[in-house]
Amino acid sequence: MIERRPFDRLGHANHGWLNARHHFSFADYYDPEREDWGRLRVWNDDEIAAGSGFPPHPHRDMEIITYVREGAITHQDSLGNKGRTEAGDVQVMSAGTGIVHSEYNLEAETTRIFQIWIIPDRRGDQPRWGSKPFPKAERDGRFVTLASGDEQDSEALHIRADAEVAAVTLKAGQSAEYALENGRRAYLVPATGSIEVNGVRAEARDGLAVRDEPTLKVTALEDSEVLLVEVA
């Protein structure tokens, strides 16, 4: 089963400095049929104006993954971490017992991100933050794991959840496959381009909610960049 969730039907909040679309219930947007997708709780599509951002605010017991689509985001937190994550790269924050952080677009242009929240396997762990650049060429034509709860994914950023975040870039006409074990779900969003997944078409920034599909064949109808989250 693959359900398409068109971009123009997502939850929407425009605060001037922040133009946000919500794939799942978030803040003032509530849809009882879109509370979560397995352990995936939030997928926000955020456009952050130059010189603005999120002032210090707290989180607790959530795995928060930020994928930068365009521009860069600068993070600072109560643990003393500070870092800048650029387009195509990922940062992970395990909120654990509690962390206060800020995220600002210090660039001269709009920054566009996907922010993803995944429910952790357990509560009350120590908070932490990490960021990592990923060579863009490695994901040409094949899925590359960016963040994972599997210790064997040693090249990926670690998250404390039974989940995986992967990305692929495809030229028009090119395909890549992703295998899902029995009972697991996936959620895909083409950051750019247009794709077809097992016969279901999605345009840029649409969501595809997937379950009961052992193999996903992702075909680019035009040059595309795709982000996928696999969860229990």
Swiss-Prot record:
Top-rank taxon of the source lineage equals Bacteria
Entry keyword annotation includes Magnesium:
no
Q: Which cofactor does it need?
A: a divalent metal cation
Judged by the first EC level, this protein's enzyme class is oxidoreductase
EC numbers for this chain: 1.13.11.24
Q: Which reaction does it catalyse?
A: quercetin + O2 = 2-(3,4-dihydroxybenzoyloxy)-4,6-dihydroxybenzoate + CO
Gene3D superfamilies referenced in this protein's UniProt entry, alphabetically: Jelly Rolls
Q: What keyword terms does UniProt attach to this protein?
A: Dioxygenase, Metal-binding, Oxidoreductase
- Cofactor binding comment, as recorded: Binds 1 divalent metal cation.
Molecular function (GO) terms for this protein are: metal ion binding; quercetin 2,3-dioxygenase activity
From the UniProt record, give the pathway where this protein acts: Flavonoid metabolism; quercetin degradation
Q: Where does a divalent metal cation bind?
A: H57, H59, H101, E103
Question: What CDD domains does the annotation carry?
Answer: cupin_Yhhw_N
Reported function? Putative quercetin 2,3-dioxygenase.
Q: Spell out the PANTHER family in the cross-references.
A: QUERCETIN 2,3-DIOXYGENASE (PTHR43212:SF3)
Q: Family per UniProt?
A: Belongs to the pirin family.
The name on file for this protein is Putative quercetin 2,3-dioxygenase PA1210
Species name for this entry? Pseudomonas aeruginosa (strain ATCC 15692 / DSM 22644 / CIP 104116 / JCM 14847 / LMG 12228 / 1C / PRS 101 / PAO1)
